[in-house]
C-alpha cells in the first residue's frame, strides 16, 4: 500500500503498521484468539470504528464441527465457543451470512441502522441491531487447498464503516489467513495427537520425542480393562450395533478415568490401557474412584441394553502399580507411543484372571498396599500366571464393587 489511508475526517489510518505487526511480531504467539484480540484493538487505535469481530473456523475434532472466536469492544480476552456437528443443518445457520460466505459469497454486508421491508428474518441481525451495532460485514478467510473460513466485523459508528475502513480490513485478510492457518493447523495436529495417543503423549511427541526407543520411566498405577464375550457379540450383531456398543462401553469406562486424572494410552479392540502417574499423590485413590464411577456407568448402559433386547455387558479390570517405560516402540517407520514393562504385564495377567476368579476387578498386592486399602479388600490368594515364575497375590473388593467399598 503506497501510504496511509484516510477516513472522511482526514484522519490517517496506519494499515501498513498493523500489517507489519501481523507479519513480523506475532511469530511467538501460539494462539490465534490472542492475536485476533490484539489485531482488533490495534485497528480501533488506528481509527477503524470496529466494535465487534468474529473468526469462524471448521476444525478437525471428534466432538466439535467448528469454533467461533469473538472479540467486542471492552473485552480483553476473546470469547470462544464450540459448535456441535449438525449445526450446519439448522435453519439459523442456513439463513446466516456464514452459510452464504462458506458457499462462495465474496462478501455479505448488512446495514443495521434500518430494517428493510424485504429483509429475511435473521436472529443475528436482530441481536446486533438491539446491541447498538450499525453495520456488519462477513468476509471469506481463504486457507490453502480451498479451505474457506469466515471473519466478520461490526461497527457501532453512525453510518457504519466507510469505504476506507473496509479497504483496511480487506487488506489484512491474506496475512490474517496465513497467520490463522498456521495456528489452526498446529491446534489440529495437537488435537489429533491428543485424540489418538492422549494429552501427555501428544505433548512429548510435539516436543520432539519421535525417535524409536526414546522415552521415560514413569511410576504409575495401571488399569487394563477388557470387554467380555465381545467376539461372540461381534459375530451375532450387525456392524453398526457393534460400533454403537463399543462406543457406549468406552464412554462408560473412559470418562471417569479422564475425569479423575488418568490417561488412556491405548484402545485395544475391546479393551483399553490407562495409567495414573504417581506424581499425583492421589493417583491410587483416583483410580479406585474412576472404577467405581465406571461400574455405575456400565450398569446404566446395561439397563439400556436390556430394555432394547440386548445382552448385558461383562468386563474385567486388572490393576497394578509400578515403574513402566513410556515412549516410542515399533519398527523404523511405524511407531506406537505406549507403556511396557513387568508392571503392565502383571496388570494384564490380573485382567485375564478375572474370568477364573469370577470377579470383575482384581488388584495386585503392590497396588492395594500403596493405596492403603488392605482392610477394604478381600485377599483371594496367590495365583500362578503365565510368564511369571512365582504366583501373584490377588485382591478383590470385599464388598463386590469399588462403589460399595468407598
Language-model regions: role of each:
Residues 74-134:
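Regulatory sensory and allosteric helical modules in signal-transduction proteins
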Residues 12, 28-70, 74-76, 260:
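Helix-loop-beta substructure at the N-terminus of cytosolic sensory domains
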